[in-house]
Amino acid sequence: ASQIKNEVKISNKFLTKFLEKELQIKIKKFISNEKIKNIKKIKILNLWVVRQFKGEYNPIHYHNGDLSGVGYLKLPKGMTNNKNLKNKKLKTNGTIDFINGQKAFLSNSIYNLRPKVRDLIIFPNYLMHTAYPFNINGERRSFSFNAKIYFKK
């Protein structure tokens, strides 16, 4: 359902050989911050690279597995600038929204994040999210993954 023309799936062989261990370390750290200790195994289900260009976006969606993540490899300079929207508190060009529940008193349902190169964001697979388009020339390159968590019995 993506409005992005260039997504490349990374082979399981490459993933296992070069990326899986590092991602497992990052996921273990994320899980330990949540005080979860009975992890038996973390399996990276899949990983793909997304090349997003001017005007492209990824509509609201969620993932499979238990945890998902996005890492930012390249961002166009000035990606979040938008000359058409002066005096706006929230500028969404090229940003990512995480969406959960409904807006309620003292509770926001949308968390907007302005990515930076080298950011790695890990989140529950069911958390709805969207990547907004940007209106300048350049490439936003990221990778996304899904992971399954196996617990000790």
Residue ranges and their predicted role:
Residues 146-153:
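Double-stranded beta-helix
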Residues 45-122, 139:
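Catalytic core of non-heme Fe(II) oxygenases with the double-stranded beta-helix
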Residues 58-59, 130-131, 152:
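Short catalytic/ligand-binding loop motif for oxyanion handling, primarily in non-cytosolic enzymes
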Residues 1-38, 48, 55-58:
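Non-heme Fe(II)/2-oxoglutarate
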Residues 128-142:
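Ligand-binding loop in jelly-roll beta-barrel domains
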